[in-house]
Amino acid sequence: MVSALITVAVIAWCAQLALGGWQISRFNRAFDTLCQQGRVGVGRSSGRFKPRVVVAIALDDQQRIVDTLFMKGLTVFARPQKIPAITGMHAGDLQPDVIFPHDPLSQNALSLALKLKRG
């Protein structure tokens, strides 16, 4: 009985590692594509038992949003998605509470993504 539980735990742990690597691979490919389109800002919300949110935006020289990346979820099945509503908008015109009216975690991540780091 104990060896069966240990076996199940090891299989679950290996599956978690494999699926986590798959998720990171998908995110890295999407992020590389985003980085080729201009300057990139990244924002991440945190929370222990809440879905994590990652928002990345690519800006051109006129501070217009060229492309976006949005990931939200608790599990390894969260996929990178786009935010089509803000593509083409000027970064100064964005209001995260209007884009995500009922999602404070996404609002926070978008606010952080709009604050590009110099470097």
Curated annotation (Swiss-Prot):
Membrane-spanning intervals of the chain: none
Keywords: Activator, DNA-binding, Phosphotransferase system, Transcription, Transcription regulation
Protein name: Glucitol operon activator protein
Pfam families membership: GutM (PF06923)
Record feature DNA-binding region, as residue ranges: 23-29
Function: Positive regulator for glucitol operon expression.
Biological processes, Gene Ontology terms: phosphoenolpyruvate-dependent sugar phosphotransferase system; regulation of DNA-templated transcription
GO molecular function terms listed in the Swiss-Prot or TrEMBL record: DNA binding
Disulfide bonds: none
